[in-house]
Amino acid sequence: MINRRQALMSTLFGAGYVGLRALATGLPASILLNPRRALAGGPPAGCATTTKAQYILLNTSGNGDPINANVPGTYEDPKITHSLDPAMAPTSLTIQGQTYTAAAPWAALPQSVLDRLCFWHLMTNTPVHPKQPDVLKLMGATQAGEMLPSSLARHLAPCLGTIQSEPISQGASSPSEGLTYGGRALPIIPALALKATLTSPAGALTNLQPLRDQTLNQLYDLYRNGASPAGKAYIDSLVTSQQQVRSIQQGLLNQLTSIKDNTAPSQVLAALALIQMNVTPVIALHIPFGGDNHRDIGLQTETTQTVAGVAAIAGLMAQLASAGLADKVTFVSLDVFGRTLGPANTDGRQHNPNHQVSITIGKSFRAGVIGGVGPVGNDYGALSIDSKTGKAAPNGDIPPVTSLASFGRTMLAGVGLDPAVVSYEVGEGQVIASALA
């Protein structure tokens, strides 16, 4: 009988733990699965999107957090309610030479992060928590009902050479936050489970060096007698030395050992380890930003979690830079809905189907503010967007109801997908050209 650890190892590294062998040797899993073809022909055919391909860290919540209440674009109208806590004081920040106002935590981000930070004012068109999977499917706009993170993962996997094409969910706090791939529900792998599996005395990372030697020995005869000159040169350029393996092993062990729980900072550590092991192109996190705050006296929960949430993003960006991954990873957020903004929301906020703010931080997307917010019904909602400028416009060619699909199209375009593929994967909306770097 397969135990839980074996099942998790198989999920992470594939049958025969080929992904772990790839980590130990430096060789792509595709070579280990079919070494004869790889050795005979040299490097595999290149991916058309390699130069733009990114790992994606998706922050997603079925709670409908009030991110939309404290970002640029919400401070021009004095009737919009903000936390009065000094920690959330309206503060100026500069993005791409333009001055905006946001809650203090956003303004405290390093300028290097602000230079890549974009706020997207969108409409998800639902006030219902369990509709989170539908929002990730762009409310019916995706091909065959695929989730946006899964579509991204499927197209990015061959470009990044990841072990698997399925995304991984670490932070799901409810069933509605789980991911599907091709209609199949995917397992949730919390940070502590990843730590326990990989760092135990008999865990995967403690045996990388012997696994490297064993795998290369198995390939040696084929390498010596069956490899073309191009194949040998390609393999030689990829194989990790024993010293490199020791460095990889110790670095990942140190990183994972520091995980103490399943909170946002621990999810960040686990996600970085998964990227460094090249397991998957897309990892879903849950960083709280106020939660389902119907009753939130003085908006204190919103304040506390926004301060902590932005700090978690700052920590993530610092760790990406330290690991040399700042140009290889894009942070994206997408929640089921936002919260109400009007004057009656000083002690809590209600569900808002008309306004949700997403965030992107990465080299593929231009920093700034996409769209805007204005009065809608009894509260506020996202405004129409001009697809050429990205600005809110009364007669914009992207009405609020297609802003979510347009966001999805722009995400796919940003990581290098061909326009025809983008249109096929997301059948509504438009690419917002000004949002692309």
Give residue spans per PLM region.
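Intrinsic-disorder/low-complexity recognition with aromatic hotspots
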Residues: 27-119
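Solvent-exposed loop/turn segments at secondary-structure junctions
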Residues: 61-65, 124-128, 172-176, 289-292, ...
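Feature marks hydrolase-like catalytic cores characterized by long aromatic- and Gly/Pro-rich stretches
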Residues: 85-105, 293-301, 307-437
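Anion-binding catalytic surfaces of enzymes that hydrolyze or transfer phosphate/sulfate esters
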Residues: 217-322
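Extracellular/periplasmic catalytic domains that process cell-envelope and extracellular macromolecules
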Residues: 47-52, 110-114, 159-162, 265-267, ...
